Amino acid sequence: KSAMMVIAVDALAARSIKRLNRTIQITDTGIIPGSGVGNYRNAITEEHLGIPVIAIGIPTVVDAATIIADFCMGLMEENKSEPEEMEASVRSLISPKLNTMYVTSKDIDEAVNRLSFTISEGLNMTFVPRV
C-alpha cells in the first residue's frame, strides 16, 4: 500500500516576535523547507509527491532585523509618528546583514515540547477513531 496523504511539520521563520512559538499555521499547499531562512530544499507538495500534503508550521525562529523593526515600531507608535515616517525610519536602521541572523527564545526546548504535544493531540483527535 502507498500513502494516501503526507502531513509535514516544519519550523518557520516568524515575521513578528509576537508570533514566535505562539501560532500554528496549517495549509494544504505543502511546504518548501528552509525557504523562510534562504536555505531552499526540495518542495513537499502534492505536485511533487502525487498525493495531498497537509503542512503544519510553527514559527520558532526570527531574524534579528525583525526584532529591531518590532522594537522600533513600538517606540515610534508611542511617539505617535506617522506610519510612512515610521517605516522609512525603521528601514534605514536595519542592516541587510541582520536579515541573515536568526535567533530563537531561550526556552525553545520547552516550547517545542509543548507545541509538538498540542499538534499530536490535534492529529490524534482528527485521525484516530474513538472507541
Predicted regions and their residues:
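A structural signal for small-residue-enriched, beta-sheet-centric alpha/beta enzyme cores
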Residues: 9-131
